[in-house]
Amino acid sequence: MQEIIAKKTGVRVKETWLTGQTDAEAVGTIIAGGEYPDFINGGDSMKPLYDAGALVAWDDYIDKYPNIKEMYSDAEWESFRQDDGHIYWANVFQNKYGEDKTTTHNDEAFWIQVRVLEWAGYPEIETLDDYFDVIERYMEANPTMDDGTANIPYTILCEDWRYFCIENAGQFLDGYPNDGSVIVDTDNMKIVDYNTTETTKRYFEKLNEEYAKGMIDPEFATQTYDEYIAKLSTGAVLGMCDQWWDFAYNVNDVYKQQGLDLKGCNYVPLGLTIDKGMDQMWHTYGDTLNASNGIAITTSCKDVDAAFRFMNSCLDQEIHDLRFWGVEGIDYEVDENGLYYRTEEQRVNAADTGYQASHLCTYSYFPQWLGTSKDGKNAMQPAEQPSEFQNGMAEPLVKCFK
């Protein structure tokens, strides 16, 4: 796929991912060396790159490349403007074209496996107490999986910047959305540090209580991200609090390959509160623009126009379809109504990590669309195509939604 895209755009990008370093460590090393890749997404460390003068300003290029300009309204583009008056990066993950076709909660939640819900008769779970109650009862009746693997009631990821998995819960349990490191109380227009609230105190008391009962993974405080993902990939972890994007891309395809989805190991999100009857606003991801990071072009790039031209091409519908749907007749089909779909074999291939590595090329950190294709019919990405979302679900997940 990369070769097909290269022939059509004239550009081939070699992507390099962090291994064994935080974004701050990697960015610090790059800045110290003074040589930068053509493109960079520094995560939470974009500001040091900006301060080092390592980034190219976008101001003279946005209007030249209509696909890029179309990503945001004029007011939204202003959100990316830095204190020197220029724009240096853009977030590529939140852009919706046309009708919203969201099928997945892509934000943070308390997650629970559908096998637990099915066993319990799909109970109403409103509070943190309800959540741990059903996990405790399931564990008492089902201490192991079918193959003898010990179930892990609840684990927590705390490594480095991902400590949000343990820290953020207080704001959700108080009924607020994810506004970063604080609660924004719009009733009185005040900012509250959720770490100091009574709800957060009760949350940590509950974790202590569950830890004493043996319901929390004893390795939670020292496990690495890779160890955490390895545990989830076994299907043994009944629940956790995390961002969907932080675990799903790594474990969902593994479940399909190993048949764990057929055993009810997929996770569904729950919008819990600390007490019953409280309002909750946990599902608000698409409404919030994150302008703090994104893709940037560095001063080491020898052909800045070519870099912007490639990003612009990434948003052409033909290239976008190649990135996310693949090649018609090989990776997907088109029915008599012009709707894209996959055969069962194509779905298996799309979930196979080996096939993904050898054949697909999503350029996942480059500009992209969610929402509706410019043909007005299809979803920009397969996960949001209603037929693919439904056909891609294992029976235990289908039963849960019913």
For each feature predicted by the language model, list its residue ranges.
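Extracytoplasmic/secretory soluble proteins
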Residues: 1-402
